[in-house]
Amino acid sequence: YDNLRLADSAAYEAVRAVGREGGLVGCHCENGDLVAEGVAAMHAAGRRGPEAHPHSRPPLVEAEAVGRWLAIGEMAGCPVNIVHLSTRRALELVRAARARGQACYVETCPQYLLLDERSYRLPGFESAKFVLSPPLRAQENCAALWDALEAGEIDTIGTDHCSFRFHGAKELGREDFSKIPNGIPGVEH
């Protein structure tokens, strides 16, 4: 999402404008600079296969961005909807914001409830089928999301349907995981 990133000042102005109109801002929360550092670290270590993808985007990358967007929303007086939430740590930040009285919402996806990081341990290039962002996480994050769902803390579940053909698309990253188109199918047709 490098071409979609905003400076915090621009994000604040946009969120403030949406808030003035009574709107809600949806936020994909990953710190792009930290992701770039993670990708560079994986490359420097010679890790270029799809199994390196989750290591380039550890849970803290999501949590930092969730905290930042919650702060921007609070300062701007605009509710935020954190989309594709995948970690317990990010969920705890949302809980803290809600405890302060901040209006914020959470969306997660079936893949974060049902799949985990073991999908990145498949033989050969098969793990490329599971390259998405945020990446699949450790099982304890899945369990935390299920608990939050049962407690009514997750407001929506969305598919984030973003499918790519394995042959001809996902294969673009055969030599470099950072070139694999991110996304998995979320709708059967």
In which residue ranges do the predicted regions lie?
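Short phosphate-coordinating micro-motif centered on Lys-Gly-acidic
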Residues: 160
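Histidine/acidic residue-rich metal-binding segments in metalloenzymes
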Residues: 3-157, 173
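Cytochrome P450 core scaffold surrounding the K-helix E-X-X-R motif
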Residues: 168-170
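Gly/Ser/Thr-rich active-site loops/lids in small-molecule metabolic enzymes
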Residues: 62, 175-189
